[in-house]
């Protein structure tokens, strides 16, 4: 679906309906609970797509790419491959610290990760919006 508030609203309704019927949600949510996002926010991710020469001409654009927003749901038969948490926004990078907005099995959290956190900091440096992240909150 398009990564718009309306696209997310429709997916959220479908999510609630499928979960009520016993479906197993695999992604992007790391849990089967109700979505913890407030009604004025929406879960969306970004994918960079290459533009053809014709596409650039039609759009009057100079950049050879376009950042497309989307939202999605993935269901499966078992929860064995479900992420522990998911990065919801682009990480905020500061000197010696990275702040992540995560959806975890226990809800939404803002996680500051410092250099002294070792392997967690290394994972945070590589993290992008939409990635699974190895943190149980």
Where would I find each of the regions flagged by the language model?
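Conserved beta-strand signature within the Rossmann-like core of class I S-adenosyl-L-methionine
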Residues: 1-6, 24-28
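Short, solvent-exposed loop/turn segments at secondary-structure junctions
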Residues: 5, 32, 79-81
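A short acidic (Asp/Glu
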Residues: 7-12, 37-39
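Conserved S-adenosyl-L-methionine
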Residues: 23-33, 51-57
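Conserved catalytic loop of SAM-dependent methyltransferase domains
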Residues: 30-43
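C-terminal lobe and adjacent flexible extensions of AdoMet/dcAdoMet transferase-like proteins
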Residues: 45-137
């Amino acid at each position: 679906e398009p990564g718009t508030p309306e696209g997310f609203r429709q997916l959220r309704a479908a999510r609630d309906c499928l979960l009520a019927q016993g479906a197993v949600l695999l992604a992007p949510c790391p849990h089967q609970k109700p979505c913890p996002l407030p009604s004025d926010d929406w879960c969306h991710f970004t994918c960079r797509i290459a533009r053809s020469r014709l596409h650039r001409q039609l759009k009057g654009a100079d950049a050879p790419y376009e950042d497309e927003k989307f939202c999605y749901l993935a269901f499966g038969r078992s929860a064995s491959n479900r992420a522990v948490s998911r990065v919801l926004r682009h990480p905020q990078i500061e000197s010696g610290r990275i702040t992540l907005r995560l959806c975890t099995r226990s809800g939404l959290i803002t996680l500051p990760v410092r250099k002294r956190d070792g392997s967690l900091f290394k994972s945070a440096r590589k993290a992008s919006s939409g990635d699974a992240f190895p943190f149980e909150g």
